[in-house]
Amino acid sequence: IPVQYSSAMRPLDDWIVDRVELVGGPSSFLNGAGAVGGSLDYISKLADRYGDFMEGRVRYGSYDDSEVAFGFNQALGIGPEPKHFVRLDVSRSGGNGYVDRNSRESWNVAFSLLSDLTPDLSHTLALEYQDEQEDSPYWGTPVLNPYAGELKIDKSRRRENYNVADGRYEQRVRWLRSILEYRVSDSTRWRNTFYHYDAERDYRNLETYRYNADNSGVVRSNAFLQRHDQQLNGNRFELQHSQPLFGLASDWALGFDYSINKQTRFPSTASGPFGTVDPASFEPGHFYDLPGMRPGHRKDRSNEVRTSALFAENRLGLTDELSLVTGLRYDHLDLDVRNHRTVTASDPAHFERRWDVLTGRAGLVYQFTPHANVYLQYSTAADPPGGVLTSASFGQVRDYDLSTGDQWELGSKFDFLDGRGSATLAAYRIVRRDFSVADPNNPNLSVPVGQQTSRGIEAAASLRITPKLLAEGNFAWVDAQYDEFTENVGGVAVSRKGKTPPNVPERVGNLWLTYDFDPAWQGGVDARYVSSVYANNANTWHVPSYTVYGTFLSYRLDERTRITGRVRNLTDEVYARFVQSTPLYYVGDPRTFELSVQTRF
């Protein structure tokens, strides 16, 4: 269920998550706009019928990074066939962070009740609550002058935090789902999901830092006070049906989704600059001491997005080996925006806009052996103008049309060496049109891009080399470039055709080796490589490639309990996990140690 706002996608505590699925290619027929290239589906833990258990985990590591978590699944009632099952998962995590004055605390609770109302009808009530607080969030490390070629930082200052002392990020999230499932027959079943999402997010930070001309001081600017108040309510109905079509095996997935997504934003900003500080010794100051900032939140805009969607997918067995997969999705979007501040020509009191979107996919899958297939597919997708309708301004909606895209993908999945190994290979071409990117002069604004093309190859494999040694790895190569994009540079229009978008590595690779010393002891090493990325649209700035290594050793105390020690970034590599065009260098985590104990009984 997408909440249609990227800022809401904060990392979740994995304790309440059952699994994460990569929905590749054209997932748009189920999950809506933005699915060319795939999407991630975070699936929460739910009550089930497969046995009672209790489990827990305790973790502690560098920089006081810690977690305490527990959960249980329990049948309610007495008898050989219980009708109700309950699950509860709770976790508390936190830490002081490797950056000065940065700390974080998070609570996560997930509760679900599964009730078998009849042998064929069941209902699941699922509730989730997340509460996160982060003090003095890290917004990046300033880059040394001059800005040319490879961007560099003062590595001795990698842990400095230039945010104010009372910088803050908070979020409170509540999820409710009511899931009704009915098995009509062996060939037909349906599911109805009512969902409610309520979130409040608060930001209070000083976010931009630059060195002065001789790199002796850091100039701080861009104070940002913000609150997001968001509610999403909707209902999704899904039907699965298997019935021959023209004498051929046929499986259908049909559905309807209606939602109302409303968000009110309360921004206050002051650009500054707010003076120069000595990076060797400075007082971070307090947010409300900054000129132009004062306590309290003032409404800016309320955006309401109503979405009505119909989707259908069919898998048709043309032969025993060859299948045709098709899918269609129709979306009707209604945007209603109300301005709570001063009315101007560029920011009217109220405006509306509507869109009708039809996207789809078609593909062939050939199963040439029981353990190998090859597929070819074409898909289309659409994104809202300006990127996010729940925060879109009048200018963004006026100046942008729907962002569209299409994708060709050719791939194969197969097992080898008598099942000891498995692999996936894919080659793709993605074209995106009429979308937006962050304005390099003001990351809170966006600028339009006409078209971008990406071509790439992805491969993943696992191999049981010996009964005790398992190797897993993946590799991705991509060639991404702007086809139509003109950027305003000092009042002059400059074409960026042929340039690579920032923060897009050409190559990424991962490798994991796991060895079972004996039934109780297990160890492993891992490596991750990311090639150099550009830091601006002109491709005149870049940050270097990096490789980070890790290792772990675990001991099974008994059938229920495992103790694991882990080291990340073994060589204490200093690297940029992300870079902004201001430019700011987001330094990756240093070397860290962790010890955890997990049990289940």
Q: What residue ranges belong to the model's regions?
A:
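C-terminal beta-signal and adjacent terminal beta-strands/loops
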Residues: A471, A520, R528-N536, T551-F601
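Structural signature of Gram-negative outer-membrane beta-barrels, strongest in the C-terminal barrel
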Residues: L114-T118, Q230, L248-A253, D257-N261, ...
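Acidic/polar loop-and-plug regions of large Gram-negative outer-membrane beta-barrel proteins
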Residues: S93, G97, A110-D116, D120-R183, ...
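Repeated loop/turn-to-beta-strand initiation elements of outer-membrane beta-barrel proteins
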Residues: G79-V86, D120-H123, S187-W190, G247, ...
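Face-selective signature of the C-terminal outer-membrane beta-barrel domain
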Residues: R174-A199, N222-N339, T424, E472
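Membrane-embedded beta-barrel scaffold of Gram-negative outer-membrane proteins
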Residues: I179-S185, R189-Y195, A199-E207, Q367, ...
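Outer-membrane beta-barrel translocator/receptor signature
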Residues: W15-D18, G24, F29-V109, L117-L121, ...
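Gram-negative outer-membrane beta-barrel transporters
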Residues: R420, R429-V431, P448-N537, T571, ...
